[in-house]
Amino acid sequence: MRFYQKWTGIRISDGKKSEEFCAFVPGNIQYDYGKYVGFGDPMYGENCKKYEALENDSWAYVTRLSYERKDSESVWFVSEGVDYKYDVLINNEKIYSYEGMFKPFELDVTDLLTGDDELCVFIYPHPKREGAAEGHRDQADASCKPPVCYGWDWNPRLLISGMWQEAYIETRTADYIFKCEPSYSLNEAMDRATVSFDIECSTGCKVNFYDAEDNLLYSGGGKSFELESIKLWWCNGQGEPYLYKWTVENAGNKKSGTLGFRKVRLLRNIGTHDPAGFPKSRYPAPFTIELNGRRIFMKGSNFVNPDIFWGHIDEKRYEELVDLAVNANMNIFRLWGGASFCKKEFYDICDKKGIMVWQEFMLACNAYPNDDGYLSVLESEAVAMIKALRLHASVVLWSGGNELFNSWSGMSDQSLPLRLLGSLCYTYDKHTPYIMTSPLEGMGHGGYKFLDEREEWRDVLQIFRSASCTAYTEFGVPSITSYESLKKIIPSEDISEITEAPSWKLHHAIGAWRPESHACLETLKRYFGKEGTVEERIKQSEWLQSEGLKAIFEEARRQWPKCSAALNWCFNEPWITAANLSIVRYPAVPTPGYFAVKNALRPSLFSARIPRFDWRSGDRFTAEIWLLNDSNKEIFGSVEVILLIGDKEVPLLKWENATADARTNTEGASVCCTLPAVDADSITLILKADNGMENEYKLLYERKKTVYAPKGMNM
């Protein structure tokens, strides 16, 4: 039986202890302390900077144990994870120490108990590499603490720690089941499975195995059995994410879970070749997911920590976010290495909903060391992660981390941390693919703006139609958050204009990455004029994000099968940002950009390849018309292409009886016309079609050619 304790917290600063305050488990102790002393809403203004004064402090969770037990039962302290370096003490006696936040532990404390016992979890200050720049994420490059906590362009610097996962006292009988882990192998036809259970228990156990409809398929004391005519687990859009159910039980204990049968491989992209002439190099790194013998176009997003306080994330939040991905026709999340691991409930939900998971380890944008101390912690944490996730059908890819083969990280395939992670994935989950980092050769990260001065002021429509990557695994277009959300974070005296005021900067509108990130006011002025209210800038940025992301996703789909993936940066955010690249605002609010992505990721649709976003009277407007299909059936349809200019509709094309084979695209005809001089600020290309395959594109139109030019831009 489980007994949840009431905890108090203590801050230890310069050797001095604070008064005890109420601490919640799961949770983060800095949040509890901030609430106790009155830091205020961490989202508002600059309140979250108050937590910086706590970075070098130690903390203690303390409880007077409360439980009931029979004489025949043992007593255990169980924790799913504590962040980050800590000791566990019973009655001031240290019984366990660990560095890391992802490894669970369970401690038999029976013989240490007196009947009036104090349990303490003592947490050391946050790891900071000696010599690293103060306040910089380089401080995280010698530890396994997720570096996002040290500050990112969408996450404030907020070093948190504590009992972020569930913890409890548990009484156990002699027949307690300590381990119960199923595994399976499939025959070549993938219609028969051999299922095995690894069980640790002092007495015999009964295994029951059910299909999703609760029909009993096997029951007995054997730990291995065969199943005929099995159903496979499929990702969203490709079939049913079918999950079998199991129980393992004896007279006093019972464990249960689910199991999905699937086979996954990472294959070389069709259309990629080694160089034609000598001297030769290799072809681009393989990056096509094959699920159950079927090549899948990965369409999804980068998932980041859903809260700045990781202990507050619960199953409800995870389910809201995963449901949004499913409804947006996505089939994969990349769990970015800077934030890395989620709680168990997230993976359970992805299993159930059919969202594949590309899981990165906790390395990102840093040069991680080869020294034995770091490698020892990394190995322990990585093994815990692999063992926790290898049973999940949704976890289809492991990665060493984010952007480790780039100039700002400087690692390589000879770096010991990445070699270690590869060996661990092979040892503990060898049938799931592993890559050392993203991007690999051939893959692309970026860009992160609609209009980029470093790309000769080309917009994303121009940039991506000329790109040719095997996968676009990060790209983004920012937008400014809603005015209602801004009122929750920006003081009233600053909200009337986007400026370099501290709250705007702290919430990532100005100087988050480049000086203009992420509000990108220069881009908005370029397209819409120098003057504009905050409300107008919000609408303008939403327009750019919507059309930009739609264009990129559809372009990546047109490049299938050479291109195998499109994942925007990013899906969600951990707090209310003033401006960001996310398509779901905190906590789980879809943006207009989200709905544009949802439309772009429909299984089948007509699509237009448009040369650029902004047009003027007298321009020769052109567009290629395509039929995109990543469904598993041949599709048929007809489309009428119309250009709406002001209140005038200009018919451009009728494409009748268009067809596309399963998971194949068809290129149709091109359309063109000379744009007249009309009184309008936009034109809309309309693709009228039946069967939910319609589409439209709202583009900027200017009658006059004089526009505002940002400094340094030639017109």
Located regions from the model:
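Substrate-binding clefts and catalytic carboxylate motifs of secreted carbohydrate-active enzymes
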Residues: 11, 15, 159-162, 398, ...
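Flexible loop/turn segments at secondary-structure boundaries
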Residues: 84-86, 127-130, 267, 305-308, ...
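Soluble or luminal CAZymes and related metallo-dependent hydrolases
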Residues: 57, 317, 377-381, 413-417, ...
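Short alpha-helical segments and helix-capping/turn motifs at coil-helix boundaries
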Residues: 105-109, 150-154, 453-462, 550-554
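An acidic- and aromatic-residue-enriched active-site/binding cleft used to recognize and process polar
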Residues: 82, 91-93, 100, 112, ...
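Active-site region of glycoside hydrolase catalytic domains
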Residues: 178-180, 246, 258, 383-502, ...
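Secreted/periplasmic carbohydrate-active enzymes, especially glycoside hydrolases
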Residues: 1-333, 558-559, 563, 589, ...
